[in-house]
Amino acid sequence: GHASQVLVRKRRANSMLEETKKGNLERECIEELCNKEEAREVFENDPETDYFYPKYLGCLGSFRAKLFTATRRSANGYPDLRSCVNAIPDQCNPLPCSEEGYLNCKDGQATFTCICKPGWQGEKCEIDINECKDPTNINGGCSQICDNTAGSYHCSCKSGFVMLANEKDCKDMDECSVKPSVCGTAVCKNTPGDFECECSEGYRYNPTAKSCEDIDECSENMCAQLCVNYPGGYSCYCDGKKGFKLAQDKKSCEAVPVCLPLDLDKNYQLLYLAEQFVGAVLYLKFHLPEITRFSAEFDFRTYDSEGVILYAESLDHSTWFLIALRQGKIEIQFKNDYAAQITTGGQVINDGLWNMVSVEELEHSVSIKIAQEPVMNINKPGSLFKPTNGFLETKVYFAGLPRKVENALIRPINPRLDGCMRGWNLMKQGASGVKEIIQQKQKKHCLVTVEKGSYYPGSGIAQFHIDYNNLSYVEDWQVNVTLNIRPSTGTGVMLTLVSGNTLPFALSLVQSTSETSQDILVSVENRVIYQLESISLCSGQQSQLEFSVSRNHLELSTPLVKDVIYSEDLQRHLAVLDEAMKGTVTTYLGGLPEVPFNATPVNAFYNGCMEVNINGVQLDLDEAISKHNDIRAHSCPSVWNDKTNS
């Protein structure tokens, strides 16, 4: 191309030749007129001659023809012919090179050469060289950013970096050191070119306040059922009272599984006597001829040692007759116009077997037979109930007393009776339609088979007031508990002490990580202070757990393990319990009363058999201040036996 020819053209030998040529031009073409041949002799080459001669004729036209005027002069800018002609061979006038990029201009034979400044290229030095794209010097030698500029370039750094003295390399700026308060109360962590304000897990950085703020995970619906947010975290809970427990993911809820199925088969011909915690199961009213004497026959089954079987009274309440159980034996109490009497006797019948009992009023006595064998004969003056208007009218209550009759008895009795009755015949009137009444009511039906014990169905609790103060040391208290348990589910609260809305002590079961075993948890408020792991409690056998706790001592034992627990933490937790024991605590068996769901680690009801001894006293659920109706005080369903496999 043309440009390369320009670059390789031979340079004139030296400035001496230039001077010679200038003198020849003056002589030949300015002082004299020259034709093209004479001009060729001056330049000694064709390109320059061809370039010069037309322009020479132009100068002659301007000046020799006396046409020089102010206008003309201003047009070509030459004052006289000499100036006009001398300027023609100078290819660098007017300047053909880019002013920004050229260093100087070299006149040549009918051409010119632009010498470029560093950073420029092109025939006229009009093209900027992009040093940032130079393959031999990648990125212009800059470590981060190369900025190309007209005729040059410079290096710069990304945000968060500073330029080193060599003006090419960048170094990370440690914002955490430069601006110590940049993150406020959060922790500043320097990163390449930047910094981060870090918060602990469960907190989020607020750039406006420059502080860490607690994330309310509960507002993000993290939990399936119940959620409690606390600074830096959250906990999920499930409604144990509805039979749910927390799943392995600690967020979802799952049904508390049954680990030991029970035989809950019922029969409507068996009347369950403990359906109500207070009051009778049902009552009958008789309106019979006046010659009728009192009689009652029935089959009876119980493990309970005390309670009311039947209570009969006149309509005006003045006369009454009681058939009860005391210490496992039949007791008769009655009061009429003639006498008030009490008799207990016969053999013990609270053996869980069916016993046929008959009570019959004879002319001068009341005869009591068990299995048709006479066991008692009670003398009585006159008839038990006095007829009115030619009729004998009585009310007979099953398994309970009406109103506040307890106070009127000759000897007080706990009326509650966990037992079953079948084949009853009162006043010789047969079943008196009772079967039809109870047939529709599941709750009045008895389990076909039961064992000795107490049963918690996983739906309620029993409440006791127990004084734990040690009588010999007034300042001291002691809780010694023995539990005989046969759980049917692996999760539930067995025993808890409640003070207001808090639970200063609880003993619970939770399903272990293994399907077949359970853990025992001891907790103070909502903290587990001890966990006894992996015991197989759902085997169908009774297991005995013992624990004793005082203000500075906790001991737990099972048939396989005896543990005396001691730790600094334990002392702190026992101090919480000690404080509660100075006030009033209520004892609950089988679950929790209405307290906040997060008051304790486990809130499911206990499901299964359990007998409890506290400080040497066997607790009788009939003596509870209150008890859920479905808790059985003296009977427990048998383990379900798949009849098809046996």
Curated annotation (Swiss-Prot):
GO biological-process terms attached to the record: blood coagulation; fibrinolysis
The record's tissue-specificity note reads: Plasma.
Domain of life of the source: Eukaryota
The residues that the database entry marks as glycosylated are N470, N480
What's the subunit arrangement here?
Interacts with C4b-binding protein, a regulator of the complex system. In rabbit plasma however, protein S appears to be present only in free form.
What's its job? Anticoagulant plasma protein; it is a cofactor to activated protein C in the degradation of coagulation factors Va and VIIIa. It helps to prevent coagulation and stimulating fibrinolysis.
Q: What is this protein called?
A: Vitamin K-dependent protein S
Q: Which organism is it from?
A: Oryctolagus cuniculus (Rabbit)
